[in-house]
Amino acid sequence: MAMDTKFDDVLTGEQKLRNFNINFGPQHPAAHGVLRLVLELDGEVVERCDPHIGLLHRGTEKLMESRTYLQNLPYFDRLDYVAPMNQEHAWCLAIERLTGVAVPRRASLIRVLYSEIGRVLNHLLNVTTQAMDVGALTPPLWGFEEREKLMVFYERASGARLHAAYFRPGGVHQDLTPRLIEDIEEWAEHFPKVLDDLDELLTENRIFKQRNVDIGIISEKDILDWGFSGVMVRGSGFAWDLRRSQPYECYDEFDFQIPVGKNGDCYDRYLCRMEEMRQSTRIIQQCLAKLRVEKGDVLARGKLTPPPRGEMKTSMEALIHHFKLYTEGFHVPAGEVYAAVEAPKGEFGVYLVADGTNRPYRAKIRAPGFLHLQAIDYIAKGHLLADVSAIIGTLDVVFGEIDR
């Protein structure tokens, strides 16, 4: 009998050995930045998936409380650094709502144009690295070639490829040249062909489908429970897009469709992103057509924006205004506001509390990736280890905005 109990102990010891913990990341190529997951595996099946975040935490929200509204703008480029201008947009909208500034029409169109370029930048990176995570080599090379062209458009508008600081409260920093508008138009004509090539390579690819179909399925209840937004919602069959449901800027004038999925799995989210790039290209083309007709200023001239260069050379008041604007900054009336934009990753929101001074009292940043990553344990449970990287890929996480 004593022998038997010993034998049982050995058996339970054997069973104890079956669940083992491994670290996924932070330097894993599929970890998309500095994600660290502690995975508990039963054989190859994921029992628990524990995300450890904070490796890129810079205290953005706290830093913002000690700087002027304009000095805070560049912090937004450094959140989701894959598509920087979309974040600046939310910050500018929040300030404009509190101060009651009307943005000139041309500036509004330029904002929409560059927000959509940002969406294409983001989805190109996501779709192609998603393919790379499951073993394809060609798509990332093609995707980065196209992103390079768009980065050049960023650079020609603002002088920077990545951290543009181009959107300003009251408009955009400077006007686009006619030549740039022509070049973007030329790119937009050729881009659908690139998407067709990507489509041909991935959409019906047997291996790509096996790795993505029925992986990470999300239901309507999950969406409401976890607070998903963006492609995570649309992939499950709900046409929820802030550009259509709560139009901001001048999105209500544009003709575009909202792609939705059916099963809510990784594959449907991939298809949504592919189609969204096509729709963004349509919006870009409509924008360019409108920009050719709409002339005018790109900044609402007043207390929020600097005076024109020429004026500063002749007017003392303009010079003083310029100096005060960049040292002390403008004052925003006391109040609170929530401004949200449909960023490429989902609903990016800024909850701004102003106390009437030249600095925000408190700014809360709602990063879509944060809410998506929360659910990784729930989504990945019961999947295989290899599926975890496919799931992370379609959650579309970037750590600038998650850790902020």
From Swiss-Prot:
**Record's subcellular location:** Cell inner membrane
List UniProt keywords, sorted A-Z. Answer: Cell inner membrane, Cell membrane, Membrane, NAD, Quinone, Translocase, Transport, Ubiquinone
- Coiled-coil spans in chain: none
Pfam families reported for this sequence? Complex1_49kDa
- Name the catalysed reactions: a quinone + NADH + 5 H(+)(in) = a quinol + NAD(+) + 4 H(+)(out)
> One GO term of the cellular component aspect?
plasma membrane
In short, the EC number is: 7.1.1.-
Q: How does it sit in the membrane?
A: Peripheral membrane protein
GO MF terms listed in the record are: NAD binding; NADH:ubiquinone reductase (non-electrogenic) activity; quinone binding
- Report the principal subcellular site: membrane
Which HAMAP family does this UniProt record tie to the protein?
NDH1_NuoD
Q: Which family does it belong to?
A: Belongs to the complex I 49 kDa subunit family.
The free-text function statement in the UniProt record for this protein reads: NDH-1 shuttles electrons from NADH, via FMN and iron-sulfur (Fe-S) centers, to quinones in the respiratory chain. The immediate electron acceptor for the enzyme in this species is believed to be ubiquinone. Couples the redox reaction to proton translocation (for every two electrons transferred, four hydrogen ions are translocated across the cytoplasmic membrane), and thus conserves the redox energy in a proton gradient.
Question: What do we know about how this protein assembles, alone or with others?
Answer: NDH-1 is composed of 14 different subunits. Subunits NuoB, C, D, E, F, and G constitute the peripheral sector of the complex.
Indicate what this protein is called per its UniProt record: NADH-quinone oxidoreductase subunit D
Organism, as annotated? Cereibacter sphaeroides (strain ATCC 17023 / DSM 158 / JCM 6121 / CCUG 31486 / LMG 2827 / NBRC 12203 / NCIMB 8253 / ATH 2.4.1.) (Rhodobacter sphaeroides)
